[in-house]
């Protein structure tokens, strides 16, 4: 460093300049300004060698300054004598009296924000903990401030409630309390364990047909079976194909054996290390300290099997139940390998891709906390955060980049300082979702750009084993690690099903009412299938104290829910994958999902990491097939399955109360519309001012490019939505939310054709000609029936 060079160049009898001398007062400030914010917490050699003398060094500085001032005053301002006296007390460059000169970042202050001794004391209460993501948000006042939303619907509701408090609404509140008490009694009396003849039961381990209903005979059973065949939901393409391992195609099984690494290799790696604890995995001390500070004392099964294999650099395809610690399973080996990286030249070596930005934020939080005792740098690149801030972080070439596919491609194409040629590890979290059609184009663009010699790891709770999909990722003899059977829920999860009789599907909110006021379920997480399907319901639930899940750093419903300010969190399938929200005891499916895979992800938001939880599903007659699949999977693992019956009269009372909110909701929506218009006008005015003020800078910016057109992006979005929610959701728009029997039969036949890989079904001549076999058959039979009539007429 500069001080040591000055000591060698100057003679012994001359005074020595130090960093605290007045003749060079700006050296420290310049060094602090040039150090980037991302590197501020990085320990260095100086910090490691300073030790406990840092505190003493500061005290000695003050004493030196005091002595220097006293001597200079006594000598009439002779600075040289003061400096010579100061030099006599210095024992060495890094001695006890010169331990911390202020020109370094202390190793004991690398955790920003405090919290506890290790900065992680509040980990259990923080949940997502995306404070680092907030730093990248640019608001009206610049970087580091939160984005101010244009219109806050919850604030409008609060204002209306405050106005009504002064108008004598105490009587209404008393009536609501009485209704709440009635609902609790009925709810407790109707709880019963799901019987063999209940809705969704009667499914033996080896059977897949429709059995008898609650009280029906043979006639009722035939009608129910016919209704089931007409109104069954569309399954995921891989749902039926992978439902039973015994029915798998022999050819596909042979391809898997050739594609995946031999199971013996995986088992041998697991047996070599004592995997009952993290200490037996030969992990470095900084990694062990990070695991201990977070509260990880014993590896989960997926962690015990994955970490040793990932440390060897092999490709991994991993699957385990929700809440089993899959994130730490790939973060820990990544951190361990990065500890031995060359540090002279900063290089981006790891890329983690997630399907949603909320999951990316959570993964970033977990990784930064596990790496809190290391010098590994992370960057979060997701939509909704400032591009400029992210470009600045990527310019420093962080070790790990956690991103969503769209924003990663944006930086890859338009950020000149961001290079991906040195990436050594690629991780796809929730890989089965990433391999769907909605992400196909983006994932292909990323995979063709990254180096082919990389290590690739795929993880999901419903991991696909289809070789055709996995080949796209470019895996090289991956180790297949499936800890639990696929589509399996946690053992500590109790599953409840509320049956909606035919004709009562429109009164779902009435059946949901008792749960809104049930004190047993004061912390509930509502997952709705799609926003369009429940467009009026979010407003009703807001009046009941619920929040709709949006970007957490904007509206922060997760923080309000976690802090107990609200009791309900309304969310779509966007939040059904991967998110670990603290405090969720109950998950309520307002509508049954389209497939068992989505059901497993939804109910996996509770009963995580060994905790207990409850999953409640409001199931109508068209949901029978999914319910039976869920019940069968639950029975196979010994889970508790309950059938809950809510009296129709009570549901009607709740529905009437909810319908009374319609007028108030219309007024709220009108007020929201007016505020949105005002916010839009303000934004346009601000935009015009910026165009005039920064015209030259705006025109000087290079135009951002994309690898596909807007039409291609729209098609990809529609494909992703269709695969997530099923084709049935798109066809509902034709019949105002209802499907005709003809459309239902078309969808069922399409679902059967999608199962051709396992059943061996092939298109016939009629299908190849573009006409269905049934339609072609009708054309053939018509001439035969009309021919005799024509001959009689001629005679």
From Swiss-Prot:
PROSITE patterns: DEAD_ATP_HELICASE, HELICASE_ATP_BIND_1, HELICASE_CTER, Q_MOTIF. Residues 56-70, 779-795 have a biased composition (Basic residues). Disulfide bonds: none annotated. The keyword Cell inner membrane does not apply. GO terms for cellular component: cytosol; nucleolus. Residues 466-684 form the Helicase C-terminal domain. It is found in: Nucleus, Nucleolus. It catalyses: ATP + H2O = ADP + phosphate + H(+). It comes from the Eukaryota. ATP binds at residues 320-327. Associates with pre-ribosomal particles. This is ATP-dependent RNA helicase DRS1. It comes from Chaetomium globosum (strain ATCC 6205 / CBS 148.51 / DSM 1962 / NBRC 6347 / NRRL 1970). The gene is DRS1.
